[in-house]
Structure formats: C-alpha cells, structure tokens
Amino acid sequence: MKKFKRRLSLTLRGSQTIDESLSELAEQMTIEESSSKDNEPIVKNGRPPTSHSVHSFLHQYTGSFKKPPLRRPHSVIGGSLGSFMAMPRNGSRLDIVHENLKMGSDGESDQASGTSSDEVQSPTGVCLRNRIHRRISMEDLNKRLSLPADIRIPDGYLEKLQISSPPFDQPMSRRSRRASLSEIGFGKMETYIKLEKLGEGTYATVYKGRSKLTENLVALKEIRLEHEEGAPCTAIREVSLLKDLKHANIVTLHDIVHTDKSLTLVFEYLDKDLKQYMDDCGNIMSMHNVKLFLYQILRGLAYCHRRKVLHRDLKPQNLLINERGELKLADFGLARAKSVPTKTYSNEVVTLWYRPPDVLLGSSEYSTQIDMWGVGCIFFEMASGRPLFPGSTVEDELHLIFRLLGTPSQETWPGVSSNDEFKNYNFPKYKPQPLINHAPRLDSEGIELITKFLQYESKKRVPAEEAMKHVYFRSLGPRIHALPESVSIFSLKEIQLQKDPGFRNSSYPETGHGKNRRQSMLF
C-alpha cells in the first residue's frame, strides 16, 4: 500500500500532497471492494460521482478550464490494467467510472474524503462507459440545481461558462446544490441591483431591482433583522409557504439572501397591484376584466386551499398585476397552513375592510372560508369602483355590514345571539338591501355569485373551486378550466384583457411611486 501511494504521488502532477492526490483521484473514481479472488477488471453499470461545487461540476463535465482532467497513468495500477485502459474499443473514448463503496452521513463516499483511512482497497471493480459530450440545456441546469421553474439563465451566461455535459444520471447532494447555486449567484446580494424604493413598512423595505443573472426585473423585500428577536414570524411563514406554492396566479419567490442585518426575499416583479390598477382606470373597470381578475383570484386561492393554506389577508394591495393582465396573489406574511382538525388561530389577521363578520366578533376557529368573504368584497369593489365596507373600527365595520346585509338573527346566523361581543354592541335591527342597488353594473349571475361569498355563516360561503365553475364565468369558455396549474389563462387566444373605460394611458405603468407603492409587500 505504501509503495502504491509513493508511486502515485510521483506520478500525479499539480497536487501538493499524497492526500490531495488521493482526494483528487477519488473525484474521478471510487475504488470498489469485491469478493473476487483475482484482479481482472469487472465491467459494470456504474453511476457518475456527484460533484461538490460548480467548479468541480464544470471540471468533471467539460474541458473548459485550463487544468487538464485527471488521467490514470498506466504505471499506477499495473501493466495489465493500464494496457486494458489504453485500448479503445469500437473507436470510442472510454473513461473510468466507479460505483461508490460506502456513503457517509454527509452524502460523500468514504474514499472521496481527504481524511479517509490510509487503507485503500484493491481496485477490483471498475466500471466503463462511453463519455458523450453535449451542451447543457436550460432544462438540464434547472433539473441539476433545482432552480425555480421560471428562472431562465441567459444563454450568454452559459456560453461564458462553456458548459457541456453528459446526461445527469443522479441529483446533486443538498450541500453540493447549495454550493453550486451560490457560485452561480443565488443567495448573494451583489447579484441584484436596487433601482428604486417602492415602499417602506415597520419591518421591511421593498425595492424595484434587476437581477444581473437573468436581466429580469425583481422586487426585493428587505426585512430588517432585530438581533434580539431574529426574523419576524411573518417572514418565516411567507418563505416556508411560498417555496412550496408554484402556480401561475401566485407570486414567485426567486431567491433568498440572508445577511447578519437583513433577510431579503427576491420576488418576480409585477407592474402594479389591483388598488393601483383601479386608481389608474378611474375606478371604472371593464366588466370583462373584472371577470378575468376574479377568476384568477379564485384560481390562485383554490390552489392554496387544496393544500390547506389560508391566505388570511386578501385585499387589492395584495393582488399584483402585470401589463398582460396576469393577476397573482402576494404577501403571504399572515398566511398559514391549516391542519385538520381545525385549530385556534389569532383573530388579528385580516385587514379591516375585508375581514369577515365571524372574525370581527372574535371567532378564532376558521377554515379556508375565511378568504371567501374577502373575495366577495374585492369583487364588489372592482364592479362598483368603491369599497364595500370601509369601516374605521370593528364596530363601524360590523355596522356597515349589518346595514347592507341585514342584522343577523338566530335564524340567519345560528349561534350569533349567544355571542357576547354581538350582544354588547346592541346593533339596530336592519333589514337586508338588494345588492343590485349598490352594484348596478353586475348582472344577475354576478349578483348571485357575490351573494354566495357574503354569507354570515362561514361554512355556507362558496369554496373557491366551486365558484370557478359558476355560470358567471361561462363566457370565458370551457378550455380555461382545463389549464395546468402553472399555465396562465392568457395562454388561451380567446382570453384577452380589454381596455377599461376610465383608463388613463399616461398612468400605466409609471404611477404608484412613493408612499403607497407596494405596501402590499411590506410587513
């Protein structure tokens, strides 16, 4: 064994020590233990070793770096094996590939470590395979590094790295993938350029930015970290939920940058939110666009609710829209995953104007139906151009609700008469008013749908999945219901945004800078 290591150290060039030589050699192959009595090579189907960083990844799969790939000299293993390896078969070049002998707890083979034991098993098992060079596609890179589905690394970047590779036969280890992503530029603040401040809140500041990696616009949500408290729980919730929510109508979280002083969430950038959109069209939206936006809200919510995720803070400022008309749910800071059976949650969660009456009266046991009341309020606001229940206090909010929908009774809302807060307010006995009087632009089907959202009893509110099938959306055609989750409704040629009657050309998309810009993305 000592003679083997001495000969190896004299043969391999570019390494400073024997251990380094062995470690470098281990990246090309792993010696396999066998019960075979002789030393003849055994040809087996092996798997390529896992790379440990972008540089080693590129080194293994390309010849683009100056350092030549490591080759096994004929004199190292012995004449018979050396001559065997030197003989090409069928005119093709063969490379050595070995199966891992044993995987350690860190995902690396025992022989691949520079601190491995000096005892090296005799190389009795060798795997050979043809080395086929090909250019890595974007799909390969996404698969290899688990990049977000809509991240498109520019072709020029791939050309600069000069990457070419055989097919990927196994995923990278978690540690290797982290290193690879970091070396590409993910997780680093220097990858992003701040262009302008969009808004500032208690815990966070939001900037419009640009990614140097993709050249795309991004929204940078910079959350200040208090050393005593760490990251706000809202930030932790948002990250933990968004990383698992991949849908055409949910904002995409591209990257996370963590430093000692801040946690920056890198989102896809959309031009404006629904509040700004309504302001820009003078609060007179095309009823066709109202229908398209409502459908997209329901589509994103249905996806969340199928996964038992409650948004809990629906409002126009949290619905982002791009120039194409694609609407996406944003700001999941108050969202949380709901387990079964129902648990008790905080009742201080939803913006006042869009908060359902059961939560206003102190209920802390709720399900996905908590979001559906807010959908009804937003539907009304888009159709009428004004908020439905703009209360300034909890009592004022309840008063506005009861005055329009009628003061609830034991018959219309079982259990309300025993609610202490309801009894303490002592509201007048209002009779319900026809909704059509307040939203005359809605047709009868729209009035029927909004009524299904605005139910006092939460369990009677129509679920998002069911609402998408309502006759109100019949004019959008049948194909919209068969789209994959990741595909935009605007991929259908029959789905097009119309010009709004009150739209001001000069205001799109440059308005909204300043104090109220992107308040939806702030804590």
Swiss-Prot record:
One of its GO terms (molecular function) is protein serine kinase activity. CDD domains: STKc_PCTAIRE2. Its EC number is 2.7.11.22. The active site is at 313 (proton acceptor). Residues 110-123 have a biased composition (Polar residues). Residues 514-523 have a biased composition (Basic residues). InterPro entries: CDK, Kinase-like_dom_sf, Prot_kinase_dom, Protein_kinase_ATP_BS, Ser/Thr_kinase_AS. SMART domains: S_TKc (SM00220). Gene3D superfamilies: Phosphorylase Kinase, domain 1, Transferase(Phosphotransferase) domain 1. Belongs to the protein kinase superfamily. CMGC Ser/Thr protein kinase family. CDC2/CDKX subfamily. This is Cyclin-dependent kinase 17.
